[in-house]
Amino acid sequence: MQAAVVPARSSSWQMKDIPQPQPGPNQVLVKMHASGICYTDVHETLGHIPGEFPRILGHEPVGEIVATAPDVSSRKVGDRVGTAWVQATCGRCEWCQRGRRNFCPYQKSTGLNLQGGHAEYMLMYADSTFLIPDNVPYEQAAPIFCAGYTVWSGLRWAAPKPHERVAVHGIGGLGHLAVQYAKAAGFDTIAISHSPDKDKMIRELGADEVVRDGKGLAAAGGADIILSTTNSSKSMTDSIQALRPDGRLVIMGADAEPLAVSPMDLLIKRIRIIGSQQNDPEYLFEALDFVAKGKVKTIVETYPLAEAPKAYQRVVDGKARFRAILTM
């Protein structure tokens, strides 16, 4: 089968022919239909996330089951499925026992120590798969397994109250979904975007207002929750000034630079800084349900699998608007 392979740290993606895998215990073989390229793929390619090379990345994989292991009874051939970052865990550590599998130190993760979705076929652990609603196209479903899951988890983890105001910082691959989720959930939603050329589109996504920075957000009345999808620690720091008392900054973007925050600001306004990822399988179900009901739509660029290196470079250069999807 054809696959996009990262042969070594910081190397270019290469299309290679590799053996098609066969399902082992508790696994299903999935004929891939779409696989999203996330900016985390860049971090993995550069070796920022530990793991062995060569690698086949892709942690937004969706497709159709074409074979199952004999012990699998919950899934069948023909099912439309996807899987998220964490597929399997040890089941014995403290975090597994507490139901927080995403913290298991022995987890098996899609595209990290398990083959990812940037290939014609992929193995998935059956009990880690989610059924995709029949009315959701594969290209729309794929980004929800990371981008959508992540931003909806962040909003849920912040536990907004009905009267609270939500700001989304950074309108890109995650941010354009965060605006839609916040609005679909019924919250007054403000977007923080440095790009005036995006303003019309951002309002069409559901934003009630668009501001340029933290100062602009403060002038507009501030926010109770900021969903920060930017990759700039400096911008995150700037936005904190606009949080209202008891405000929450939810960080979903990554930057190697430290976050410079005044403890006095946190103390006086009782501000919380929350790191958030894919927090609960229930949130993935909810994130997909919004898409199935037509309340959230991903803006995607699609590329055939053979053009994976080109699509990856679009993501590296920040030119993809807003999610790059490989189709098979």
Residue locations for each model-derived region?
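Glycine-rich beta-strand-centered segment in the early N-terminal region that forms part
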Residues: 21-35, 48-94, 128, 133-139
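Rossmann-fold NAD(P)-binding glycine/threonine-rich loop
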Residues: 254-269, 282-287
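C-terminal hydrophobic helical "lid"/dimerization subdomain
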Residues: 1, 237, 281-328
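Adenosine-nucleotide cofactor-binding segment
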Residues: 165-171, 183-238
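Helix-to-beta-strand junctions that scaffold the AdoMet/dcAdoMet cofactor pocket
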Residues: 243-245
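N-terminal Rossmann-fold NAD(P) dinucleotide-binding loop
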Residues: 175-176
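Short N-terminal strand-loop motif that marks the start
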Residues: 1-64, 124, 210, 327-328
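NAD(P)H dinucleotide-binding glycine-rich loop of Rossmann-like/cofactor-binding domains
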Residues: 89-169
